[in-house]
Amino acid sequence: MLDTPVIAVAGATSKQGRSVVRSLLRGGDYRVRAMTRDPASQMAKSLERQGAELVTGSLSLGSDDEWVDAFSGARAAFLITPPTPPKGSREYELGCRIADAAVRAGVEHIVFSTLENVDKITGGRIFAPHFTDKARVADYISGLPVASTFVILSFFYTNLMEYYVPRVEDGSLVLPIYLPED
């Protein structure tokens, strides 16, 4: 078991992180190190019961040494950045620093969950920093001395139930998603 490669998963208790941890554990080819700000949380303990190793690794600026420790000994790392409020977004800096910590720890391969660069695509007409900042982090990771893979996922269906709760109006199902008219 000690020869089995370790994959560290940042944001392991998030929707995406939990899915990655569970999939890797089910595959059985890797040991999974689940990075979370609170290893004592119910969600983290659930991952531990499934076979993940829990380590402290908060997705917040100033956790650089914590990240290096969490990534140490891992062959690869799955990284996410949490969406942050548009004003004062530090997602780009956070993503770069997490990736740098993985490289400093000796990780050989980074998998990063990214999105499209909306600023570039629209010539700056549409403001979507949670997309653009992730794309900029992917560009940064591409320049690091490690192998890298980037995944772009669709909208999470569960977000409909949490943020855009469907409702019935006049006999029609309405999904209150904010989209431009064009």
Segments from the language model and where they lie:
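Oxidoreductase cofactor-interface core, primarily capturing Rossmann-like NAD(P)-dependent enzymes
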Residues: 1-46, 61-72, 76-93, 100-109, ...
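Rossmann-fold cofactor-recognition segment
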Residues: 48-62
